[in-house]
Amino acid sequence: MVAVELVGVPFDGYGRSGHQAVAAAALRGSGLGAALAAYEVTERDAMVLPTGSRERGTQTSLINEPALLAMTEEVGSRVTTAVTGGRFPLVYGADCSTLLGTIPALRADGPVSLLFVDGHEDTMPLDVSEDGEAANTELGLLLGLSGQLMQGPLSERLPALGRDELAVLGPRDRGWRQQFNVGSLRDSGVWMRDWQEVAAVPEDLARSAVDHLKQNARRWWLHVDLDVLDPEQFPAQGLPDVADEPHGLTWDQLTRALTAAVARGGCIGWSLAIYDPDQDPDRSDAQRIVRLVADIMTALPATAL
């Protein structure tokens, strides 16, 4: 039986109260624990972070820097403790910046690859980022494409990922990136398939992605940004006052892709990000996320490797 360690992250990348900062609590309240009843589940004391700030920080130039730095440190510690103890960490809530804690911490214990499932490539350079949100930049920081002028403890752990240790499924942000003259990782040698390709053959491409990752490391981490979904399928993504990128995967396509990926073996943990309970008053989206978790965990082999 897989032993699961839940890691709820009460962080909002814009420093807001509510929104993504309460996503973990909303998912717990919508039956996340019950969905994992077939597993041995542990969860440590609730994570406590500094009060959110909407100012850019002096070390990273990113918004909500004090909470970001504390969060990445805590997430990294909890994830590595879980993996070392033979448990499967499920990091839930917050945004994609949790990867700035997870990947460097895992890297310290040996090679690790990343399957990144997201509607955006998240490689916005720090000097180009118009809003200073870490979750627009984290993949570029992990790869060392940006962040050379950062200071402090986070900068000391970066870069932490090679281009051949990354596979990306689902982006649909070409138009947005072009506004800032930011190229695609696909053009620089990263294994990537966009949302239309994934929608056509989700299982095949997910398996191919994992096979690519396992050429470079036996262990790989799964990260899912739920904005890979079509906003008509999942409205509680993005910012309340900003139009979401149209199109994206259906729940069925995402489930099929993730199920095929984890069934391939080698997945040592999973982060699930970008859910805004403030845009989900009846919690129907939260309940759908919980169903996704249950479906994917069922496909996980009894041993991670």
Question: Across the structure, where does each feature detected by a protein language model lie?
Answer:
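Catalytic cores of soluble, metal-dependent hydrolases
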Residues: 2-90, 102, 184-305
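Active-site flanking residues adjacent to catalytic metal/cofactor-binding acidic residues
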Residues: 7, 94, 117-119, 169, ...
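Active-site histidine-anchored catalytic micro-motif
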Residues: 84-156, 161-165, 264-265
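Short, structured patches in soluble enzyme cores that scaffold and shape functional sites
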Residues: 116-119, 143, 165-173, 194-196, ...
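Active-site environment of divalent metal-dependent phosphoester hydrolases
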Residues: 124, 175-177, 278-279
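A general structural motif
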Residues: 150, 170-177, 249-254
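Aromatic-lined glycan-binding groove of carbohydrate-active enzymes
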Residues: 163-165, 173-175, 216-220
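Short, glycine/polar-rich helix-capping loops at beta-to-alpha or helix-loop-helix junctions
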Residues: 175-186
